[in-house]
Amino acid sequence: MFGEIINGVPFLGYMFFDSKVGIRPSAEEKLEDSIEELFRLRKKQTISPQVFIWRLNLRITGCILDSKKYGWLFYYSQLTDLSILFHLDWFVGHLFSRYGFDRPKDIKRFIRSYHEITKNISRSSYIINADRYSFEEKAEILSEIYNQRNFNKNDARTVDSLFKATMFKEVQRLEYDIQNFS
């Protein structure tokens, strides 16, 4: 029994050790693959720089939509071995170098996101909280990030409907990162 605890006991994507809670290596690898896929898509110019930054930040912070929390870090917010978060921050920086991109200043960090989620979620402006976006901010995200131009920016119902549909597609991508962890 003690040998198992020293080596870690896997459960629901976590690894439980004697004094720490970590993440199963397969869960980390899946997130790293997902992040690297964003870099590949950007390198092939399949996605715009704006979509790339938005999706990368969503992968890092997760988001709140319709009062529900989505994303890898929200799921793994009970971890106590923070070394994985420092590694993931390093990994993102490494990918910028490897793919020959300059790192924009507005790229989020895993370690800060974790602390915002665990200690400041109700007041955080760092975590993407779609529920707090104004009508104007939603319209700007649709037009500036997603390049959607053919909608009435003055119609709150249209903007809200398009924004929710767009965000739910992004949420599906986030949820894929935490599926099949057993």
Where are these regions (language model features)?
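Short proline/glycine- and acidic-rich turn/helix-capping motifs at secondary-structure junctions
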Residues: 1-8, 113
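Active-site and adjacent loop segments of nucleotide-processing enzymes
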Residues: 10-182
